[in-house]
Each structure stands twice: as structure tokens, then as C-alpha cells.
């Protein structure tokens, strides 16, 4: 079996920055708390919790009865709405903002466009943390999720009657789907449309790698958390190109791969390299695989 590694694997800059900063706080014995997962990777989150990180699903679930002088609130890589930020600053003496710089740039762009009179259309998932943080900064907006009905969007805009519309995206969405939505919006009559592709370049490059692996391999192993938007997207891209994609977090989740002569390996941007290495080693030793690095290193 030949095992082909994607050119880029592991954490992106924003995720690595957030994880390493959280580890430093925990090593300093800070009482670190966060609303939601730092990253959407179950293995990474278990390690951080084992180090002492306290994770709460929402603001109302935070227990303030045991806060101490060394307590610190963390704003995760996806960002937080201004209301949440203000609340944390009031209740904690120290707040560490680990919002990904690329995500923060999207927040700033959206606010600037709104100030210029644009009605904001967001291509993203309404329950995703990044989208929630973005919406908390805007006065009015429309979220367009995958699988949208464009006639419904047209009807909404006819009723809303905006003169100008600005399209932006959650940073981890599928770039091809974004472009298709942009193309449809640009055809609307009587509305000035500004298209702003705010999808992260790292995720766009991973999409291209997923397509390349699907075109050159018999199957592709996609390594990453089950709740990771960008990891799940890679698996869907592979399958859309007619190849089997196995979205796994550990070797135990892999099926029998003996029927495949060439298997690709790619990861989401919230997947640590040690997680990828475990799966690579398992495939290599189980199937006597030859690793083709293709520029990729683990």
C-alpha cells in the first residue's frame, strides 16, 4: 500500500496559538475557564481538561462560587460576541482573548461594511461559535446556511429592500459553495452587491489538497474531531469526487483498508500532529505501507 500525505497537516496558526496559550496558562497554575471548546477536537480538549481547564457550555452555567485571584477567562479561537466579552471582563479580573486574528479581521470587515450602509449576508452555520460571535457585532444580517433555497433568500431581500448587500463567510466554509452563492447574488437586479471571500486561505488550501488526494488515491483518511466544521468539510469534498472518505479520530475507528492500493491522509486545522502520527503509524505497520510525503510532514 502507498500512503500519501497531504502537503499541509496539523494545526493552523490560529488554533496552535490558542492551544499553546491555554497550555501556558494551565502550566502557570492559573484557574483557566472557557465557554465552549478551545478547538473542536475531542482529544485536544481532553488533554486541556486533564491539565485543569474548566469548560462551560454557556454563560449561565459558569460557577462563580469557586473563583479565585488566579482565575482567568479565555475567549476561544472562534471569538465571542461583545456582550459575552463584556460579561467576562466584569466577572473575571483577567481575560485572555485568543480569537484567531483571521476571524477577528472578518469581524472588523463586517462592522465596517455595515457602517457603510451594506446589509450583511453571512454564508455560514447559525449554530457555529464564529457565526454567533460575528452576529453579536451586527445590527441586522441574514445567515445563509449550506443547502439554502435561493428563492427564499430573494423573497427575504425583496421584503427587506436593501440598496446594498455585502456577502461574507464563516472562515471554514466550502469556497466553491461560497462562489456559487456570490454568483447568484450578483445577478440580482436593483441591488449593489459586494462580495468578500473571507474563507481562510489555509482551509482553502486544504480543500485543494482533499481534491488532489481524491483524484490520485483510492480512499482518503480524514483525521480530526467529529464536531470540527473544516474537518467534516474535507470528508465531504473527497466523497463528492467519488472516493471513500474515512473521518476518524483514532486508529480504532478505521475500517479494513486492505482493499486499497493507495490511501491519502489529510487533517482538519484543529487536528494535532501527534493524532495524525498515530493513525499514520497504524496504517503503515498494519498494511506495510510506503509513505509518500508529497511535501507533507508529521
UniProtKB/Swiss-Prot annotation:
Where does this protein act, in terms of pathway?
Isoprenoid biosynthesis; dimethylallyl diphosphate biosynthesis; dimethylallyl diphosphate from (2E)-4-hydroxy-3-methylbutenyl diphosphate: step 1/1; Isoprenoid biosynthesis; isopentenyl diphosphate biosynthesis via DXP pathway; isopentenyl diphosphate from 1-deoxy-D-xylulose 5-phosphate: step 6/6
The protein's matches in InterPro entries, at most eight in alphabetical order, are given as: LytB/IspH
**Enzyme group, top EC level?**
oxidoreductase
- UniProt: [4Fe-4S] cluster binding residues: 12, 100, 200
Q: Quick check: keyword Cytoplasm in the entry?
A: no
Name the cofactor(s) required for activity, per the record.
Answer: [4Fe-4S] cluster
Kindly state which reaction or reactions the protein catalyses. isopentenyl diphosphate + 2 oxidized [2Fe-2S]-[ferredoxin] + H2O = (2E)-4-hydroxy-3-methylbut-2-enyl diphosphate + 2 reduced [2Fe-2S]-[ferredoxin] + 2 H(+); dimethylallyl diphosphate + 2 oxidized [2Fe-2S]-[ferredoxin] + H2O = (2E)-4-hydroxy-3-methylbut-2-enyl diphosphate + 2 reduced [2Fe-2S]-[ferredoxin] + 2 H(+)
- Identify the residues that bind (2E)-4-hydroxy-3-methylbut-2-enyl diphosphate: 40, 78, 128, 171, 228-230, 270
Kindly give the Pfam families that the UniProt entry links to this protein: LYTB
Annotated dimethylallyl diphosphate binding sites = 40, 78, 128, 228-230, 270
MF terms in GO: 4 iron, 4 sulfur cluster binding; 4-hydroxy-3-methylbut-2-enyl diphosphate reductase activity; metal ion binding
Where isopentenyl diphosphate binds, per the record, is at 40, 78, 128, 228-230, 270
Keyword list, A-Z = 4Fe-4S, Iron, Iron-sulfur, Isoprene biosynthesis, Metal-binding, Oxidoreductase
Please share the entry's free-text remark on the cofactor: Binds 1 [4Fe-4S] cluster per subunit.
User: One biological process GO term for this chain?
Assistant: dimethylallyl diphosphate biosynthetic process
Catalytic residues of the enzyme: 130 (proton donor)
Entry similarity comment:
Belongs to the IspH family.
Q: What does this protein do?
A: Catalyzes the conversion of 1-hydroxy-2-methyl-2-(E)-butenyl 4-diphosphate (HMBPP) into a mixture of isopentenyl diphosphate (IPP) and dimethylallyl diphosphate (DMAPP). Acts in the terminal step of the DOXP/MEP pathway for isoprenoid precursor biosynthesis.
Please give the name of this protein: 4-hydroxy-3-methylbut-2-enyl diphosphate reductase
Q: Which species does the entry assign this protein to?
A: Kosmotoga olearia (strain ATCC BAA-1733 / DSM 21960 / TBF 19.5.1)
